[in-house]
Amino acid sequence: MSRTFALTYDYRCPFGRIMHDHVVTGLRAGADWDVTFLPFCLGQTHVEDGMPDVWDAPASDTGIDALQFSVSLRDMQPDVFLDFHYRLYEHRHTAGGSLRDRRILTNFISEAGGDAAAATDDVESGRPLKVIKSEHTSFAETHGVWGVPTFVVGDAAVFVRLMKPAFGDAALAVSTIDRILDYVEWPEMNEFKHTRIPN
């Protein structure tokens, strides 16, 4: 039976990159997961009182363009999304690349086999930004989501950090995510954290 969950992402988060590396690796290997990728704008969580929300002043945020293009692909070109999603995390965290350069974003779409012009038109329409606002706000209110990466399973939402990516090991990726999902379904354990980072 397919395991259904949602997972927040923002390309600026290094722990998001590690978690999504496991998820993408597992999905590419055929893991029986039904995953909803939820955009969660970390910039919005740092907006000071009296300042406009990111969706009202998107030019002020360093990660919102990347989120908008990813949401466009997720919704309108889903066959392209996973490759773009993985490439963008690697671009940011292994190459230190920019998330604001639209030439880079659209090149990644084209390289993944997508229609970059259609994605750009979608972003320019404002639709993806509205979706980000809606999903970010909704899950913050209904599930108390506050960060990346957070798993959402039914009524439960759990923030989880992994220390190492899967490095292409599909068996490791699948077993890791399945273990996390097992823990999500065990609410009696609320916190489990090493006092020192293991070697």
Each language-model region and where it sits:
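Structural alpha/beta surface segment adjacent to cysteine/selenocysteine redox centers
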Residues: 8, 17-102, 179-183, 187, ...
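C-terminal cap of thioredoxin/glutaredoxin-like
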Residues: 3, 20-28, 102-199
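The canonical Cys-X-X-Cys-His
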Residues: 13-16, 151
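Short, surface-exposed alpha-helical recognition segments that flank or form part
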Residues: 14, 57, 123
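Short beta->alpha junction loops/turns
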Residues: 12, 77, 125-128
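N-terminal entry module detector
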Residues: 1-11
